[in-house]
A protein has these predicted regions:
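Phosphate-coordinating loops and pocket residues in cytosolic domains that bind phosphorylated ligands
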Residues: 14, 22, 141-144, 159
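Short basic/aromatic active-site micro-motif
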Residues: 83-85, 102-121
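C-terminal secondary-structure termini that scaffold catalytic or DNA-interacting sites
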Residues: 24, 37-39, 43-51, 55-60, ...
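Active-site/catalytic core of tyrosine-dependent DNA strand-transfer enzymes
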Residues: 24, 32-35, 57-102
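Short, charged phosphate-coordinating catalytic segments
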Residues: 2-33, 125
């Protein structure tokens, strides 16, 4: 979910079964998990644009549907990942060590998702909408990853001039 949808870790940890629409293949992001003064708290998302509906890849939709079927007693509005951010970080460290790879931050999965979408040719506006960036300027922080299309533009202008 973190990598394939580009959601924030607090958004992941606040997910409940009712956030999923498997027929539509979507997940609704409308809340965030925080641990404040030793208590689990569900809050509104980071920004207004963080409230969004994300279309999931089909394979992920199937995996999440299977994951939810494993729970017998999870209520419709109970968190499906009942762990803390600290636990996620611990498991990321443990997994990286076991795999013998460099540790990355949980948030780097979100950055990797955005980088992948840029590499796939999606516009900054479409990406900002998917990941809940309040301003497209935030997405443009990844500007160095957007490929230059100057050659393609010049070639197409040549074709236009030639009447092709």
């Amino acid at each position: 979910m973190l990598y394939w949808c580009g959601i924030r870790e607090g958004e992941l940890l606040a997910l409940t079964p009712t956030d999923f629409d498997f027929e539509a293949g979507t997940v609704s992001i409308s809340k965030s998990y925080q641990r404040l003064k030793g208590k689990d708290v569900i809050t509104t998302p980071k920004t207004k644009k963080s409230n969004r509906v994300i279309k999931m890849p089909k394979f992920l939709c199937g995996e999440m549907e299977d994951y939810l079927k494993m729970f017998y007693s999870t209520g419709a509005n109970e968190r499906i990942f009942p762990v803390s951010k600290h636990y996620l970080h611990h498991e990321m460290d443990r997994g990286a060590k076991a795999a013998g790879v460099k540790r990355i931050r949980i948030h780097d999965l979100r950055h990797s998702h955005i980088s992948l979408l840029i590499d796939m040719g999606f516009t900054a506006l479409a990406i900002a909408d998917r990941v809940g960036h309040e301003s497209i300027d935030i997405t443009y922080r990844y500007a160095h990853l957007f490929p230059t299309r100057q050659t393609e533009m010049a070639d197409r202008l040549d074709m236009e001039r030639k009447g092709a």
